[in-house]
Amino acid sequence: GVSIDDNTQGLHRLMAGAQYCQPLNKNFLDAKLMPTLYYQYKKKGYNLHFGAVPYRKLMHTLPEFYLSDSINYAHPNLYGALVQITGKRGFLELYCDWYGLQSRTTREAFQLMVDGEFRAKVFYAGGYISLTHLANKAAPEPRLGVCEKFSVNPLVGINLSPITPLDSFTVQAGYILGYNRERETATQHISHGVHADIYLQWRFLALRNNFFYGNN
């Protein structure tokens, strides 16, 4: 990549690369390279990304009910914009992932996500709010309907890393509410549940355990 760092104007960076994806149960001829190309601007608590931005640029790894490891493997970048605002007590983050550009072969699809965190000593509170939109292919392809999914996930946790010999030790719990709507059939579905997570890391060893109780 190429970067220009100015104490007055901030950091400007243009990054380019590629990620190799080998589909499971396929031969090497079916593998594909997915380009990574984005512009970054960073200054005094603001960090902006535009383009094909790796998910690892997010402040935290997304929970698996938002982005499972299998989806992340095949879809390693978000395509759109990522805005991050950081301060001494926490952060606020917003992104738009436009992963389906409407055409005769592709349905229009995008996801909006807002997440944040507020910290007070070893305690923290935050959460996620997301909206996913799936629409039709371009005309004259037949209509397949328009689907929308909204979810909210408030959570609280404790970071015990500073008072233990571990590099990372966090425990958190939260509630997730999901609402799905299918416009074509005028149907809707509401699901909800509680979850708890524990994460421990010491050097190159890590352990993560997730618990969920609720409905799909």
Residue spans for each PLM region:
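Short glycine-rich beta-strand segments
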Residues: 21, 53-55, 176
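A generic structural signal for ordered secondary structure
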Residues: 12-17, 49, 153, 157
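Surface-exposed coil loops of outer-membrane beta-barrel proteins
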Residues: 49-117, 131-133
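Active-site beta-strand termini and strand-to-loop segments that position acidic
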Residues: 41-43, 85, 200
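Gram-negative (and chloroplast) outer-membrane scaffold detector with strong preference
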Residues: 45-47
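Exposed, low-structure sequence patches enriched in small/polar residues
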Residues: 87-91, 99, 105, 113-120, ...
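Residues that define the transmembrane beta-barrel architecture of outer-membrane proteins
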Residues: 1, 29-35, 75-81, 106-112, ...
